């Protein structure tokens, strides 16, 4: 019986292998569809054979391409056969087939990348990223490794790590900038970064590793800024690394925020920041914090890479296009680690929520022809600086998240010209081949969100801020938000949200701002609203809630502002709320 079982298993795996006979066309969608189909066939075989864990791994393996988000990959380490020695014969057969499917996908991705790099309508940035994606599928893929200029270690013939381990040394003299005493701080050197910190050597190493990863992700995100089609073609042909400046970038990491603020006390509003890049010192300056500081670290490191890659003199963006200087740095704040890959961009990016809220509530911001004309001083002295920064972030996302390679390329090329100080006020229109009126229309359209966006985007559980009001989202899409337990700010104004749809937000107990203007909520949602005890602002305008809401709302002791205009809450109900919650401001 056992022999028959193994024979049947072997036949199942072989039958799955035969379906690989027809090579997919060298098109990314075709490759993905073929890969998905083969993985599902393999997963079904695993189900049949009782290999539950292997079926799960197989089904969850493929990365998902979603609208507006770019996939990024760090070069993996080749580990060989990672199966435990005691793995059963069936599991070993699964592993062989699983690895073979990934090798085929890697081969297809590499061929497509080479084609894209040299085609008449070349897309070198996508080609560069696909070479990295190929290594995710097959870390030992020689064609992709060679195309990226990777080298083998002379000692054991293994592929060299993309970033050697950082080295640590104690400060042997007083630090020339911070005044840290000899032996009271550490220097950490990695391939691209030189870090000094008074926290610990381990903290410096941890930061160095994050910044080395970021360096690799930054290159994939802004390929047109630092390289070109010709250099990529030549690199693929000659199997050599693409040219980069051989420099280390300086970073200071302070033990506490207070030390950071004291060191930068001459900078305006420095107490409001979580990181700073100093042009004058050519140094990024950070303090030790939790995971919420990482987007700022990436933001400031991006400024540093843009500024120092070619030794650009100070004064970038002084005459025009300052929006892109800040917009590109804010774009990388959307980087997310998904384990075997990263993403950047997408409708859910934190920096897109406020501009979406403003635009869909009638404040369209500046026409792009006016935005591109603003220089650094004009922006930083403007009374509307926050709105301009917000629009700058959204406009950068509009370019870098665009479905058209021409628009994505235009973003990187515009950055290159800005930092070469060759840009003009007309550069954006020229590079995209669109009029400013067409760009305005495209920008506004890019801020919309649909049910499909919500239902196909992974990682929603991480969201902290979300503006969906007056988008095309319905109850169908809202069902995807049951995982959003980290939300602090949620805006649903004008959506067809009834009591049943609102129940999807039962896990959002950390909310401090909630906007429900114009929704279809009734008093039935009161028990749920009463659980949001951290709320400081609540908008119930133009809903069907009545004075029955008063007892439940009175439990929200942290509430500072309540909007009830157009609701069924009467003047008497308002007075009861004011009596229950001291200092509550009610907009009616």
Q: Where are each of the predicted segments found?
A:
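Concave beta-strand-loop units of leucine-rich repeat
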Residues: 467-477, 486-504, 510-548, 557-569, ...
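TPR repeat positional signature
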Residues: 38-39, 108-109, 113, 145, ...
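Beta/coil-rich, acidic/histidine-enriched accessory regions frequently appended to metallopeptidases
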Residues: 417-493, 509-515
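Acidic/His/Gly-enriched intrinsically disordered linker/tail segments
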Residues: 181, 270-285, 292-296, 315-448
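Juxtacatalytic substrate-recognition/specificity segment
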Residues: 184-315, 319-321, 332, 423-427, ...
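Pro/Ala/Gly-rich low-complexity, hydrophilic intrinsically disordered segments
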Residues: 66-110, 124-187, 438-467
